[in-house]
Amino acid sequence: MTASGGGSTAATGRMPTWKERENNKKRERRRRAIAAKIFTGLRSQGNYKLPKHCDNNEVLKALCLEAGWIVHEDGTTYRKGSRPTETTVPCSSIQLSPQSSAFQSPIPSYQASPSSSSYPSPTRFDPNQSSTYLIPYLQNLASSGNLAPLRISNSAPVTPPISSPRRSNPRLPRWQSSNFPVSAPSSPTRRLHHYTSIPECDESDVSTVDSCRWGNFQSVNVSQTCPPSPTFNLVGKSVSSVGVDVSVKPWEGEKIHDVGIDDLELTLGHNTKGRG
């Protein structure tokens, strides 16, 4: 009790009073007197072999030995013939952590790659198989039935093999497409034609009235015009399409003559001379 009182004093940070020290001495003397009487009664009437200066642990050890228990020096106590496998104290608050293999690890969210799990191992050799292959497992690779199905997960997408096609139907060439016009010419010669532009007058300040160009509406060069239809090259050429200048025939009651570009007037369908 003196040691305990000193420990509590150091913990509280104050010195016990004289009255408290006297009370602690009285309790300690009473405890020792009661223990001495118990030890004397056990020695005389119980035939216990207890040392002269013993404590409560010696008494407990003697009681266990009388009851047929085994008590070691470190305090391990058990019945005869039933040695415990674990040295855990039932009243202890210490809990042993379970081993790492006590609980099964959860299944991972990803799946194994087919490149590593589908191909059989070289050790899987069947003696009944043909020996024509240099390596035994090459025969397993040759048959497509041994390949495991591809397992795909949402969390880990699997890249398809390089040899797999990118789409189910191959793309047809452009010339085999149904939208390609059949009536288009098979020869690209129509791109070589240079279309004739409308003759324009020189509107610069240096030009005069007489320097304007004159348009001839009687002769037209057929070879310089664009083809009349997409099937122009598919039809046999006539005499008029060889490149010969052909004169335009007037209708009945119509007169064709050369007209200057400046003499033409845009009337938008109305005759201005008739109004005047």
Swiss-Prot record:
Family: Belongs to the BZR/LAT61 family.
Name of protein: BES1/BZR1 homolog protein 1
Pfam families named in the record: BES1_N (PF05687)
Disulfide partners: none
UniProt KW keywords: DNA-binding, Phosphoprotein, Transcription, Transcription regulation
Entry-annotated residues carrying Phosphothreonine: 159
Ribosomal protein in keyword set: no
Region (Disordered): 1-30, 76-125, 155-191
Species of provenance: Arabidopsis thaliana (Mouse-ear cress)
One GO term describing the cellular component: plant-type vacuole
Lineage summary: Eukaryota, Viridiplantae, Streptophyta, Embryophyta, Tracheophyta
Region annotated Required for DNA-binding, chain positions: 14-87
Modification after translation, per record: Phosphorylated. Phosphorylation increases protein degradation.
